[in-house]
Design a protein with these regions (language model features):
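Short beta-strand scaffold positions
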Residues: 81-82, 141, 160-161
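Phosphate-handling substructures
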Residues: 43, 54-55, 96-145, 200-202, ...
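Domain-level recognition of soluble alpha/beta enzyme cores
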Residues: 176-203, 208
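Active-site signature of alpha/beta-hydrolase-fold catalytic machinery across serine-
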Residues: 93, 168-172
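Active-site catalytic microenvironments for nucleophilic, acid-base chemistry
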Residues: 70, 97, 149, 172-176
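Generic beta-sheet signal
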Residues: 33, 155-163
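Catalytic metal-binding/acid-base residues of hydrolase active sites
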Residues: 40, 85, 108-109, 164
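Active-site-proximal alpha-helix that buttresses catalytic centers in soluble enzyme cores
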Residues: 2-21, 25-98, 127, 131-134
C-alpha cells in the first residue's frame, strides 16, 4: 500500500479501523455521555487533510453556536476536548453555556496523516500508512487511552473531537455510526443498555435511540 497517497480501498480501511478498535473494547461505567464533532473548517468544506492549526470557518462558528444551543438544556458535568484548534474552539463555545472550562486531551486528536496533510481527502483510506504520520494501530491505541481518560471525568461528559475519533469510539464500544451522524457540530448521545451501547443524534435521543451495531 502506498505510503504517500491514500489508496481508494475505502471500505476495507474503515473496516480495519473498526476491527482494531473492537479487539480492545472500552467499558465506560457511566450511563450516558455526549459526543460533538468540531464545527466546519475550510479544509472540511474542500475535503483536504488538515493541520492542527486549522480554524473554524464562518459556517463552523455558526454550527458551534447552534450545537451550544442544542446542548444548553442538557446536564453536562465535564467537557473534554481534543487540543486541536478546531475542536478546542468548538468546545469553548459550548462550555460558555455551562460555565465550564474544557479539559484538553491530546489523546482525542484526529489521526495524524503526516505528509498527506494539505492533499485531498476525498478518497481517504483509513488503512493507509502515511509518511510521517500515524499508523492505524497507533491511532487506535492513542484514541483508546484518551477516551478512557476523558470518560473517567465526572459524568455526564461531553467529548468534543473529530470524525476519526468518533469512528474509533464506535469500534471501541461495539456500535456502528451511520454517515448521517457524522456531520460537523452535530451533538450525539451515547446510552448504555446493559453491556451494549446505543447512539443517536441528540434531537432523536429522547426517542428509542438507534442501535447501530
Amino acid at each position: 500500500m502506498s505510503r504517500t497517497t491514500a489508496a481508494p480501498n475505502l471500505t476495507a480501511g474503515l473496516e480495519r479501523l473498526l476491527q482494531l478498535a473492537a479487539a480492545q473494547p472500552l467499558a465506560p461505567t457511566c450511563s450516558h455521555f455526549f459526543f460533538l464533532r468540531h464545527g466546519q473548517t475550510e479544509c472540511n468544506a474542500q475535503r483536504i487533510f488538515q493541520a492542527t492549526s486549522e480554524p473554524l470557518n464562518a459556517t463552523g462558528l455558526a454550527q458551534a453556536q447552534h450545537a451550544a444551543s442544542l446542548l444548553a438544556d442538557q446536564h453536562i458535568a465535564s467537557i473534554v476536548a481534543s487540543d486541536v484548534r478546531r475542536a478546542r474552539d468548538t468546545a469553548e463555545t459550548v462550555a460558555a453555556r455551562h460555565l465550564l472550562a474544557p479539559v484538553l486531551n491530546s489523546g482525542l486528536r484526529e489521526r495524524n496523516f503526516g505528509k498527506l496533510i494539505g492533499t485531498s481527502s476525498r478518497d481517504i483510506d483509513w488503512g493507509c500508512e502515511p509518511d510521517a504520520g500515524e499508523t492505524l494501530e497507533v491511532f487506535i491505541d492513542r484514541s483508546r487511552t484518551g477516551l478512557a481518560e476523558a470518560l473517567a471525568q465526572p459524568a455526564p461528559v461531553l467529548l468534543v473531537a473529530h470524525g476519526g475519533t468518533l469512528y474509533a469510539l464506535a469500534g471501541l464500544l461495539g456500535v456502528g455510526v451511520e454517515r448521517t451522524l457524522l456531520g460537523n457540530a452535530q451533538p450525539l448521545r451515547f446510552d448504555r443498555h446493559g453491556a451494549a451501547w446505543r447512539v443517536a443524534a441528540l434531537a432523536a435521543s429522547a426517542a428509542t435511540g438507534t442501535n447501530l451495531a
